[in-house]
Amino acid sequence: MKMLLLCVFSALALTNDALVRIPLKKFRSIRRQLTDSGKRAEELLADHHSLKYNLSFPASNAPTPETLKNYLDAQYYGEIGLGTPPQPFTVVFDTGSSNLWVPSIHCSLLDIACLLHHKYNSGKSSTYVKNGTAFAIQYGSGSLSGYLSQDTCTIGDLAIDSQLFGEAIKQPGVAFIAAKFDGILGMAYPRISVDGVAPVFDNIMSQKKVEQNVFSFYLNRNPDTEPGGELLLGGTDPKYYTGDFNYVNVTRQAYWQIRVDSMAVGDQLSLCTGGCEAIVDSGTSLITGPSVEVKALQKAIGAFPLIQGEYMVNCDTVPSLPVISFTVGGQVYTLTGEQYILKVTQAGKTMCLSGFMGLDIPAPAGPLWILGDVFMGQYYTVFDRDANRVGFAKAK
């Protein structure tokens, strides 16, 4: 019996040691920062939310170039290192894209976004390998551009060898000037990777850095507590969830795309009738969907439009708002008014904004719903590359 207990405790220790933990910090989104300064994000960026998802999906297995979303509503970031010794960068761990990029020391002096962030210096790394392939991701009316380089990428205790990444020498628009993060680390499938670069997690898998080829997100929605969240590579942590995971298969291995059976606003409105496709996206704060359906949802919860595509409700009504439910894989996931309404302070006043926004993603990629942090904050989410599935459990 003693030997059995010893084996059990050894296995538990191995499981804990095998998990790579990356603390996540929550920051005020770019949209909120711009709004606080009296600027309209849409005016400054001349951008379209759907750019990232406006993709074609060819019959072949050739990589599909993606276009960068604007990250106006990204809220969580963590730290990685590039090079030897590691040069620190803060990045959005984004399940809605597949490339890693950071600003380059060789960026233009006129690139204000670059000047305000950490920059990769290949000359200070003993493991740098030159590549030089042109790297560009379309971004609104301009493009984020630079070239590929190869170096060691450090995430927590993991050192990923020979990781290709983009050194950005040009970052368009105001978004990245206001950003609290330096770059993006994409965690979606290789199919949407620009230049066919192997995503970081694919290299983690091929180099056998984790025991299980899964990663999971805990996103803390309480603004008054720390940490902001945690990304775990190699498994899940029961301290962040209750009950069991319910899994649903990935329907298209590009984004983390799944099938949603139906949605409902209380008993007064049905959405996604007959089923619909959705992306689980850690790099998006809100829940988005086809504008016609989202407009009906906003009406059902008594929300009225603001000038930036956002909707607001009377804060006094939040406790009595209808529950919004999502049926996925036969399992019902619910969000209460307190969970899908975002309370923000602007000019000393508290506003209650809807956590839903209309977004029309054209075919062949769309139409799509996007389950961002408003959803993931309530349901601890695991992304399983071994079984190509996504799992949800109630977050603590």
Swiss-Prot record:
Active site: 94, 281
Protein keywords: Aspartyl protease, Disulfide bond, Glycoprotein, Hydrolase, Lysosome, Protease, Signal, Zymogen
Catalytic activity: Specificity similar to, but narrower than, that of pepsin A. Does not cleave the 4-Gln-|-His-5 bond in B chain of insulin
Domain Peptidase A1: 76-393
Gene3D superfamilies xref list: Acid Proteases
SS bond list: 107-114, 272-276, 315-352
Entry's pH dependence statement: Optimum pH is 3.0.
Subcellular location: Lysosome
One MF annotation (Gene Ontology) recorded for this entry: aspartic-type endopeptidase activity
Residue numbers covered by the propeptide annotation in the UniProt entry: 19-61
Annotated EC: 3.4.23.5
Activity regulation, short description: Inhibited by pepstatin.
Glycosylation sites: 131, 249
Transmembrane regions: none
A GO BP annotation: proteolysis
Main location group: other
Thermal behaviour (record text): Highly thermostable. Enzyme activity is maintained up to 45 degrees Celsius. Active at 50 degrees Celsius but with reduced catalytic activity.
Subunit (UniProt): Monomer.
Family listed: Belongs to the peptidase A1 family.
PANTHER family assigned: BETA-SITE APP-CLEAVING ENZYME, ISOFORM A-RELATED (PTHR47966), CATHEPSIN D (PTHR47966:SF42)
Function (record text): Acid protease active in intracellular protein breakdown.
Protein name per UniProt: Cathepsin D
Organism: Chionodraco hamatus
